[in-house]
UniProtKB/Swiss-Prot annotation:
Bifunctional enzyme which can phosphorylate or dephosphorylate isocitrate dehydrogenase (IDH) on a specific serine residue. This is a regulatory mechanism which enables bacteria to bypass the Krebs cycle via the glyoxylate shunt in response to the source of carbon. When bacteria are grown on glucose, IDH is fully active and unphosphorylated, but when grown on acetate or ethanol, the activity of IDH declines drastically concomitant with its phosphorylation. Pfam families: AceK_kinase (PF06315), AceK_regulatory (PF20423). It comes from Salmonella gallinarum (strain 287/91 / NCTC 13346). Its EC number is 2.7.11.5, 3.1.3.-. GO terms for cellular component: cytoplasm. Belongs to the AceK family. Its main location: cytoplasm. It catalyses: L-seryl-[isocitrate dehydrogenase] + ATP = O-phospho-L-seryl-[isocitrate dehydrogenase] + ADP + H(+). One of its GO terms (biological process) is glucose metabolic process. This is Isocitrate dehydrogenase kinase/phosphatase. PANTHER family: ISOCITRATE DEHYDROGENASE KINASE_PHOSPHATASE, PTHR39559.
Amino acid sequence: MPRGLELLIAQTILQGFDAQYGRFLEVTSGAQQRFEQADWHAVQQAMKSRIHLYDHHVGLVVEQLRCITDGKSTDADFLLRVKEHYTRLLPDYPRFEIAESFFNSVYCRLFDHRSLTPERLFIFSSQPERRFRTIPRPLAKDFFPDHGWEPLLMRILSDLPLRLPWQNKSRDIRYIIAHLTETLGEDALPRCHVQVANELFYRNKAAWLVGKLTTPDGTLPFLLPIHRTDEGELFVDTCLTTTAEASIVFGFARSYFMVYAPLLAALVEWLREILPGKTTAELYMAIGCQKHAKTESYREYLCYLAESDEKFIEAPGIRGMVMLVFTLPGFDRVFKIIKDKFAPQKEMSAAHVRACYQLVKEHDRVGRMADTQEFENFVLDKRQIDPALMALLRQEVPEKITDLGEHIVIRHLYIERRMVPLNIWLEQVEGQQLRDAIEEYGNAIRQLAAANIFPGDMLFKNFGVTRHGRVVFYDYDEICYMTEVNFRDIPPARYPEDELASEPWYSVSPGDVFPEEFRHWLCADPRIGPLFEEMHADLFRADYWRALQTRIKEGHVEDVYAYRRRQRFSVRYGAISSTANSS
C-alpha cells in the first residue's frame, strides 16, 4: 500500500461520519414543522429514515474504502496505523465519541465482525472520560422568579420556537403553578428557579419542554409535554417533576426523541442530573443515537464483567420455543439467541424472527416494547458460563457457537433490558399490586394495538414488569401489524356435540384470530379472571379489534402519553379552565 494511504482512509471515515451526522441533524430539524403541521405519518416516517441513516452511510464509506484500496486486503499493521491516524483527528473533533463508534462500524462491515480487539477498535474511548469542548452557545437558559412564577412561566412559554397560537396560555400557567405548589409547597416555590433546554424534544404527537427545577432541597426534573389541538392550538398537558416520571418518559420501551443537538455528549451530560438512574447508553439511546448507545452498552457490560465473579445462567422464567435467553444474576440485561430449531408449533424461520426484531426497532414502541441491541461474533469466557447453561447452548444453538478453547463465539444475539416476567410477577403479588399489573397488561395490549401492532402470542410469559411497575412486551417472533390480522367471531355451534369436539366446527385460515379464545388462557387463574373481566372484557370481542383496524386504516394516529391519564391537567384541574381566559 502507498505511504500516506492510512491517513487518507482515516479522513475518509471521519468525513463519512460527518455526512451521516449532518443528515441526522437535517431529519431532526424537521421535527418542529412536522409537529406544527400535525403530519403524524411524516413523524413516523422520519423516525424510520433517521434509524436507517447510520447503516446507509457506513455502507457508503465501506464502498469508498474498497475503491481507495483497489479491493486489496490490508494487513493488521496497516489497520493499526489507520486507527492511530484516526485517533489523532479526534482531540479537536466535537463529536469524537460517536465518531469512534462509526469507525467501529466501518471496521466490522469491512471484516465481517471478525478480530474485534481493543487494538483494532475503540472498545473503550481514546479520549478523556466526559470530555468537554467549547460549545458555540449554552445548552439551556435560566429563569428566576424575581417577579413571581406567573411571569416566569409566561417568559418560558413565550420564548418557545413554536409558531402556533396557544389555546389558553394563562390557564396552562395556572395549572403548572398549582402542580408545583402541591409538589413543593407554597413557601418553597419562591426560592426555586428553572433551567430550560434551548431545544424542544419531539416524539409522537408531543413537543417536550425539558428543564431542571432547582429547589432548596436539590434539583428535580421539569418536564412539560406540549400538544396541539385539532384546531392547531397549543396546550400543556401536564407537568412532571419526579425522577421516576422522567425515567419513564426517557424509557427504553419508547421511541427515540428528536432533539436538535450538534453536540450530543454535552446534552447527555446535561441530562444526567435529572435522570440519575439512566446509564450513558440509555441516555444516548433516548435521544436517537442508538448505534453509539450500543457501543456504550457494550462498555457497561465489560465493566460489569470485570468487577463480577458471577457466571452466566439461563434467565428465569418459562423457557422460550424460539429464543434461548441467559443473563448474569446481578446484571440488568438479558442475552437472547435465536435457536437453531424451533418448537413444532412455531412455523417460522430465523430470518422471520430477525425481521420482527427490526420491525420493533423502527416502529413506534409506545412505551410497551423493549428496545434491543444486535451483536455479531459475541465472545464469552467459558469459565464464566455455568455448566448447565453451557450444556443448553450446545443443545439449542450449536450452529451459532464457535469453540475457541477458553472462549466461545456466539454468531448472533440480542441484548435487551432485563425485567421480571409478568407470569412470575403475577404469582408473587396480591391485592392492589395484582390489580395494577392486570390493568397495566390490558393497557399495554390496547396501546400496542392502537399503534398498529398485534403481539400475536399474548401469554403473560411474553411480557415483563419494569422497575416502575410498567408492563412491557418483549417476545417478538409472532408480532405483526394489526392491519394484517383477520379478527373473527366464533360462529355458533351447529350441534351441542360441536363444542366437545377436538377440532373446530368452523374453518380457520392463516391470519385468523378469535379474540374470544383469549379468555381461556388469560382468565384461567381465579385470582386474575374477575379482574380481567372487570377491566378488559372488550379485548375478548372481535368488534373491538375491528374498530381499531378501521381507525388505523383511516389514517388515525392515536395519542400516546408517557404518564397516567390521571396526571393530565384536564383530569386534575379541569374545573379551572371554565374561568380561564385565552391568551
